[in-house]
């Protein structure tokens, strides 16, 4: 293995391979915990660098800008992200679709046809009498919503083989939530977890605070490789001390042990919960590249494997089983579930989710779990 080859950035492959009985090769690691690619690099360009398409032109628009912490271009990238979010969300989500949380509230809203399962206490008898069809009266959510972001920025998010890193996608998702929930006296705060640090950013209102909040989230230093994520600790930090009822948005790749399910159920007893799962194609399937050395940034462990068809099938099955375990835990908590991918138009996925969610609240369909189909697949 040549010492000139670049370090291989990978996601959680070694942990999944361990479940499949593939032996660990700890000697492949360098002194700094990184590993170097073997005969074939990790998914991305042939030299081992993750593939990132050009930022110029319309083809770059579906992907968020690079939001590397500490970069002198971070403020400019955040302004670009904000303009993109405002232009595309405001253009596609209008009226009652511009928001993430429905009633109940104290202000009367529109009447609609009764659907099985609706609360009969909200029956509008005057409209029912005029139309000879049962109607209920919806309510408008009270103002001054308090939204909390729980943002997982552990080392497994410092990875991406599509148009961006998962970390960039997580920050972009936060920007969309802030845009959809601010205004009208609403407040937004955040708990940012890297596995090494846990940062609490108080909930406040106003544009100045929203900009400062996004700068703090995007500027969170990367945790060193070998640092385990701590989503459970972040959820517990939001639960205790108890905060006023509102919206809790959990942004993570949800890789690793599902040890956070009880904490999430406890959180959902007090708040509306939305889980935003950011993923990459290579979290779900191994590339057909022959022999490759893979490194887990959250453990520092590495494995050299040959990506045979059998191993790739077993890996994909194990990854799918993990995704289903995560989805089951989120359903058990009653959380909304939005999946975003580094190779997808993330804002289009957000729009579809919000529209479907509103339809579910209005009785036109069930509350959605939006899954993203990779580009080029059916």
Task: Name what the model sees in each region.
Residues 2-100, 113-118, 127, 132, ...:
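Exposed, interaction-prone extracellular/peripheral surfaces
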Residues 120-122:
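N-terminal juxtadomain amphipathic helix
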Residues 104-105:
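A positional/architectural concept
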